């Protein structure tokens, strides 16, 4: 018997499973593919979102910044390479007034 069933072993499902492994929780991950991250997560750009499009002060903006900050620690914990490449965002003249740097 499991306490938690996690549907999908993509980025989100795997992150949830990792977090729950820190507690006394009996969890199982149910995945339709033969391996983890073989669906949508496999087709990502492998770039950590810079949060450039979120409206300042919103929950999305705060979570973008926090998640980005946590990547260094996560990379160390998992012993995986991680390099900050930066971002280049192009906007039109109409968008310059709304651009946040």
Where are the model-predicted features located?
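Glycine-rich FAD pyrophosphate-binding loop
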Residues: 21-43
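Short coil/turn connectors at secondary-structure junctions
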Residues: 1-2, 25, 43, 85
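N-terminal Rossmann-like FAD-binding beta1-loop-alpha1 element of flavoenzymes
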Residues: 2-29
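Short glycine/serine/threonine-biased micro-segments
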Residues: 6-8, 37, 44, 48-49, ...
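Dinucleotide-binding Rossmann-like beta1-alpha1 core, especially the glycine-rich loop
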Residues: 46-100
């Amino acid at each position: 018997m499991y306490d938690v069933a996690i549907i999908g072993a993509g980025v989100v499902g795997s992150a949830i499973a990792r977090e729950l492994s820190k507690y006394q929780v009996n969890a199982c991950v149910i995945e339709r593919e033969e391996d983890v991250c073989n669906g949508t997560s496999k087709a990502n750009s492998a770039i950590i979102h810079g949060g450039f499009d979120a409206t300042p002060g919103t929950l999305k903006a705060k979570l973008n910044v926090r998640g980005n900050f946590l990547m260094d620690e996560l990379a160390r914990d998992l012993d995986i390479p991680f390099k900050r490449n930066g971002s280049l965002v192009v906007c039109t003249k109409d968008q310059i007034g709304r651009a946040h740097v």
